[in-house]
């Protein structure tokens, strides 16, 4: 290895190490603080909890965090399932017909235009519309998530199919007597596994951690709050008592971290191939 390459690798490792430390320190402080009393947090912010206490988590359970956790779980699971059921099929149809029919190119271009529209531009009209339609509830929030998930998810699936799923598979299946639905269900859909994992993680992270849409749609009815919305109001309730707030953050982190660890091996392949058109 040349001297210049060694220097480049050295600085890359330095930057990665520094970046890792900057990410891990706040996470470590959050975990430690969730097991401390507030006076210990104030006096020994970076120290390991001594003694370890579960009082913050007990108070969190007593304050009904389970209900808000359930709300977030239902919204996230239903939204992800619908996205992964319909968008891959739409992407397959578009990817296979873009080169043959101009209408599919136009349709695809219109659908992915949403990527370039900032949410802040349509935030107020969307809120007013959902309220007037009587959809200022969990079902309305799911509909909005599905709508906003279409552009990015469709873009990734179409790119992945065009790059990694050759047309010859369709032709071979047709020769064997399979119709389009059978071809998609038994051949194409299983081959999209890396992209399924990628879109699952991307959308689940967004749906689970999103704060702005629940604030706009669900804030009037506390029984429908999601976990991030509960954390926001909970932090305000315990403004001078940091322990329960830190515990609520850990509850939100653990679930999505587990999902990420399960599917992480497929994410890089899905992102790298799906981003290439």
From Swiss-Prot:
Subcellular location: Cell membrane
One family name in Pfam for this protein: BPD_transp_1
Residue span(s) of domain ABC transmembrane type-1: 69-263
Keyword Transmembrane: yes
Coiled-coil stretches: none
Entry superkingdom: Bacteria
UniProt xrefs under InterPro entries: BP-dep_ABC_trans_perm, MetI-like, MetI-like_sf
Example of a GO biological process term: transmembrane transport
Membrane-related topology note: Multi-pass membrane protein
Entry's transmembrane regions: 13-33, 74-94, 110-130, 141-161, 198-218, 243-263
GO cellular component, one term: plasma membrane
Matching Gene3D superfamilies: MetI-like (1.10.3720.10)
Keywords recorded for this protein, A-Z: Cell membrane, Membrane, Sugar transport, Transmembrane, Transmembrane helix, Transport
Task of the protein: Involved in a binding protein-dependent transport system responsible for the uptake of melibiose, raffinose and isomaltotriose.
Family of this protein: Belongs to the binding-protein-dependent transport system permease family. MalFG subfamily.
The protein's name in its UniProt record: Multiple sugar-binding transport system permease protein MsmG
UniProt lineage: Bacteria, Bacillati, Bacillota, Bacilli, Lactobacillales
């Amino acid at each position: 290895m040349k001297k210049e390459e060694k220097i480049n690798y050295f600085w890359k490792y330095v930057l990665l190490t520094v970046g890792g430390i900057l990410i891990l320190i706040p996470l470590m402080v959050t975990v430690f603080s969730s097991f401390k009393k507030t006076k210990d947090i104030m006096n020994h912010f970076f120290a390991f909890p001594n003694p370890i206490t579960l009082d913050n988590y007990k108070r969190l359970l007593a304050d009904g965090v389970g209900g808000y956790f359930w709300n977030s779980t239902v919204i996230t699971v239903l939204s992800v399932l619908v996205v992964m059921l319909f968008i891959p099929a739409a992407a397959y149809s578009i990817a296979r017909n873009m080169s043959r029919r101009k209408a599919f190119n136009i349709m695809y271009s219109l659908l992915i235009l949403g990527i370039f529209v900032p949410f802040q531009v349509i935030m107020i009209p969307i809120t007013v519309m959902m309220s007037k339609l009587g959809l200022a509830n969990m079902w309305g929030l799911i509909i909005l998530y599905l709508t906003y998930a279409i552009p990015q998810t469709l873009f990734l699936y179409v790119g992945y199919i065009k790059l990694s799923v050759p047309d010859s598979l369709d032709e071979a299946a047709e020769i064997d007597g399979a119709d389009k639905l059978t071809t998609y269900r038994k051949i194409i859909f299983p081959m999209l596994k890396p992209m399924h994992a990628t879109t699952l993680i991307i959308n689940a992270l967004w749906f689970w951690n999103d704060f702005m849409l629940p604030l706009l749609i669900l804030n009037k009815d506390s029984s429908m709050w999601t976990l991030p919305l509960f954390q926001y109001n909970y932090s305000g309730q315990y403004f001078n008592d940091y322990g329960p707030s830190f515990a609520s953050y850990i509850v939100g982190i653990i679930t999505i971290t587990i999902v990420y660890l399960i599917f992480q091996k497929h994410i890089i392949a899905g992102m790298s191939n799906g981003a290439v058109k």
